[in-house]
Amino acid sequence: MSSILVVTCLLTTIGLYFYNNPLSHGRWFMMRRFINWFPLGMTYAFLYMGRYNLNVCKNALGSLMTKEDFGLIFAAGTVTYALSFLVNGPLVDRIGGKKGIIIAAIGSSLANIVLGVLTYLVVTEQLKIKLVLAFSIVYAVNMYFQSYGAVSIIKVKAYWFHVRERGVFGAIFGTLISFGVYFAFDWGQAIVDMTKANLPSGETGWAQRAMQHLFASNVKPVDATWAVFFIPAAALLVWALLDWFFIKDTPEECDFPPFDTHDASSGQMHVKLSTMDLLKMVFTSRLMLIIAAIEFTSGVLRNGIMQWYTVFAHEVKQPGAEFFLGHWGLLLCIFGIIGGFAGGLISDKCFTSRRGPPAALLCGFMFVMAVLMAVFLKSNPFIVGSAAVLISMAVIGVHSLMSGTAAADFGGRKATATCSGLIDGFVYLGTGLQSFSLGYLTTRSWLWWPIFLIPFAAIGCVAAVVMWHELPAATRRYLNLIERKPEPFDPDPMSETPELEGVS
């Protein structure tokens, strides 16, 4: 049943993509753009599976990986991810998103293979080490390659989607994230369940027998938990091959005429930018730093819920709310898609592609939900589970608007990867902070979990209100001249992106 729902969501997303055509593109352009973003997006979804399979592994390993061990391992990876943009952002701006996503897929695949081998050796007692150090190192390598994924997908998107279409593409971006979370949690848990050493004979179907044949240990009859790393590794190699054949970095590579997306690079595509120019643009832009601050808070909230609810529900029984734990990945997938489309459609249809207003509304909503979690944590499991799912819905909307859309709008095609790298880096700095903090705090009391999240939702809301009226100057001109939708507020000087002018 869950697979049918996910396929339905995927088909609905594809249908909405073809339905939303505000610039009246030709049929072949729409089809070729779909052929471009679909394999790119599915690669990104499986990157998520190869990232959050650690969560499933932690629950399966039990005492071999404590909460504090898990917090340290995940934090090592997220801090690595956050700092990697200094290298891979400018690099992807130079080599293009196609090469970037292939680097991400192959690198993450190899790292997952090593994680699987480590798990196998430790669980079968052929290697006597504590998992925390070895996993921290290899997971950090995995996250370095993972960090190429977002900047690559947004780099390609920047050339193929006009600013007035990017809110909906941001929704597609959020949908792909949601599929990845579903793959990681629900498919990952299914893999763990099918590779248990002592399944009752009446419960072994062909899929279980195949998994046992492929992954069961000949050394010792133990659960083949390592399969949760090997399967996404194989999938990533397949998608890397498809990416090589199908993805084109720009419409011009498919023989379409030059396409002005009216973002911050409009009229500036001839300007050549060095790595230092790109980094200077990012770190001296007040607006980019505001967006980064919003994404820092979204990193705390997104992983503060997604990463810890399953740990909480395993540790503190939730009578009457078992449905949330049993279908966590599916719920994150469906509600993440809703959140992504809500944010994107509200931005494009109600606020002339301004990203601040829907982000502020969603952050305010998360604040209310986090307060509800704190109030009812010990008394009403259903409200806690519902609030957790709704926070996940809203935070995907914020993330797809900021990392998936605003970075490309205000960074422009020339600097998309560097800007989205900065912003995505702050997501994972926030993730690292919550991983360290909640790994420690929840060993004292689970009440600290929602209390820790509340101020970050408030900070994100305030920062989003600050950028309420922001639009790139080229977008503002497009609205005034083409759509006849004059913007009543003067643009902030940062939205003019003066950093591009005169740089050579």
Sequence positions of predicted segments:
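C-terminal ends and interior cores of transmembrane alpha-helices
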Residues: I106-K128, G364-K378
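C-terminal membrane-cytosol helix-exit motif in multi-pass small-molecule transporters
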Residues: T12-N21, A233-D260, A463-W468
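Cytoplasmic helix-loop-helix junction between adjacent transmembrane helices
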Residues: V138-T175
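Glycine-rich segments within core transmembrane alpha-helices of 12-TM secondary carriers
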Residues: G167-D193, F335-G336, D424-Q434
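Helix-loop-helix hairpin linking two adjacent transmembrane segments in secondary transporters
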Residues: F173-D249
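Extracytoplasmic gate region of multi-pass secondary transporters
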Residues: R51-K58, F185, S285-F341, H399, ...
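Cytoplasmic membrane-interface "Motif A"-like loop-to-helix N-cap segments
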Residues: R94-I106, D348-C363
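C-terminal transmembrane helical hairpin of 12-TM major facilitator-type secondary transporters
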Residues: S353-M402
